[in-house]
């Protein structure tokens, strides 16, 4: 039996978000729907989830002592990481002391860097992956590239949104790629992964829920990447029945090996009927924002249900839908959005994240659309994005 208290009362159920971006904001909203007390934590003030939380804190989440202190002050029943850059050793210790880390400390620790999850998938579970090598110096990086061959991709073992990633076609690019990777890591300079290029027809995110009543799969989400970050996503991605079955088998193996209850974003390459594992996030995925319009339970609602120990039962997908990001490039601490009326309508929605400032290119919102097919939905979402005028 799951008992939920009422926010701001002595018996409140408290959820602490570690990372308070746009994904955490939607998780906070789903918690609010259930009367849960929400505490939002991030490294900067006025982060999106802080707007819809009962309280907030600004700390360096890679500082284990600072993390332990804020948890001791707030005494959350559930600790919900939204990002990778967290002192996961501290989370593991706190879990050993009886705290509930979502989905579990092992999952957050293994997936905080690409090395942990790649070794689990390829070496322990025997899942198909790209060829890869790890390196922690420029010399070993060059050796890794020689072993993998050209073309290849280099990524910091801990980064997100394409930061520090390079596509390498020739030896002349190696010095710059190494330098860029060292600048792009979430925790600063360090190890990198060198991956062989996989020939694939498309990429998918298979949103997979590990819940008290079993493992559930959302319809596959297709997406387009640019500069290492997603620009549009759509659901459902058409694929063969055999490929879908293989994708679900891989996702099931991965989430059960990681453990705990929650939603996982499993990233896969698909080529015909073949499926290759890429990465996994033990939390809602940015490409999954399409589920805000495409499903009866969004990825955020599913995550909250799962980690609270509530049954999922079933997931209803309404039909073709898409998301497209609002990604302006400017500098401002007072952003406004004009012509919004052109971005909403029947089967057309928009979300502005409420980020407090922008300096360069930053994702500030997303347009959501339905359509007769995914192609039409993508066109409608992109048109909505182009209609919005972002002002300084």
Swiss-Prot record:
Organism: Salmonella arizonae (strain ATCC BAA-731 / CDC346-86 / RSK2980)
Pathway(s) this gene product operates in, as recorded in its UniProt entry: Purine metabolism; IMP biosynthesis via de novo pathway; N(2)-formyl-N(1)-(5-phospho-D-ribosyl)glycinamide from N(1)-(5-phospho-D-ribosyl)glycinamide (formate route): step 1/1
Role noted for this protein: Involved in the de novo purine biosynthesis. Catalyzes the transfer of formate to 5-phospho-ribosyl-glycinamide (GAR), producing 5-phospho-ribosyl-N-formylglycinamide (FGAR). Formate is provided by PurU via hydrolysis of 10-formyl-tetrahydrofolate.
Start and end residues of each ATP-grasp domain: 119-308
Gene Ontology cellular-component annotations: cytosol
Entry similarity comment: Belongs to the PurK/PurT family.
Binding site for N(1)-(5-phospho-beta-D-ribosyl)glycinamide: 22-23, 82, 286, 355, 362-363
Name by which UniProt lists this protein: Formate-dependent phosphoribosylglycinamide formyltransferase
Assembly and interaction partners: Homodimer.
Assigned keywords, A-Z: ATP-binding, Ligase, Magnesium, Metal-binding, Nucleotide-binding, Purine biosynthesis
């Amino acid at each position: 039996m799951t008992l939920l208290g009422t926010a701001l009362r002595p018996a409140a159920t408290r959820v602490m978000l570690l990372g308070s971006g746009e994904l955490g904001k939607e998780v906070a909203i789903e918690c609010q729907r259930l009367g849960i007390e929400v505490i939002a934590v991030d490294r900067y003030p006025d982060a999106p989830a802080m707007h819809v939380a009962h309280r907030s804190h600004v700390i360096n989440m890679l500082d284990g002592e600072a993390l332990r202190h804020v948890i001791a002050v707030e005494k959350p029943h559930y600790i919900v990481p939204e990002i990778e850059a967290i002192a996961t050793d501290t989370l593991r210790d706190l879990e050993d002391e009886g705290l509930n880390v979502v989905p579990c400390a092992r999952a957050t620790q293994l997936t905080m860097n690409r090395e942990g999850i790649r070794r689990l998938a390829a070496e322990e579970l025997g899942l198909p992956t790209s060829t890869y090598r790890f390196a922690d110096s420029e010399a070993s990086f060059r050796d890794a590239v020689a072993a993998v061959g050209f073309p290849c991709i280099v990524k910091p073992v801990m980064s997100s949104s394409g930061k520090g990633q390079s596509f390498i076609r020739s030896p002349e690019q190696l010095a710059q790629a190494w330098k860029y990777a060292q600048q792009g890591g979430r925790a600063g300079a360090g190890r990198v992964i060198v991956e062989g290029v996989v020939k694939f027809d498309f990429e998918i995110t298979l949103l997979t829920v590990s819940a008290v009543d079993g493992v559930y799969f959302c319809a596959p989400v297709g997406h387009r990447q640019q500069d290492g970050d997603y620009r549009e996503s759509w659901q459902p991605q058409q694929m063969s029945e055999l490929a879908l079955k293989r994708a679900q088998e891989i996702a099931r193996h991965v989430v059960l090996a990681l453990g705990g209850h929650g939603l996982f974003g499993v990233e896969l390459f698909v080529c015909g009927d073949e499926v290759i594992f890429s990465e996994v996030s033990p939390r809602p995925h940015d490409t999954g924002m399409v589920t805000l319009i495409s499903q009866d339970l969004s990825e955020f609602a599913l995550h909250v249900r799962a980690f609270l120990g509530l049954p999922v039962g079933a997931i209803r997908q309404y039909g073709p839908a898409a998301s497209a990001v609002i990604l302006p490039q400017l500098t401002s601490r007072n952003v406004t959005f004009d012509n919004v009326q052109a971005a909403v309508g029947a089967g057309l929605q928009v979300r502005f994240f409420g980020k407090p400032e922008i300096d360069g290119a930053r994702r500030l919102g997303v347009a959501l659309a339905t359509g007769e097919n995914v192609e039409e939905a993508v066109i409608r979402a992109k048109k909505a994005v182009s209609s919005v005028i972002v002002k300084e």
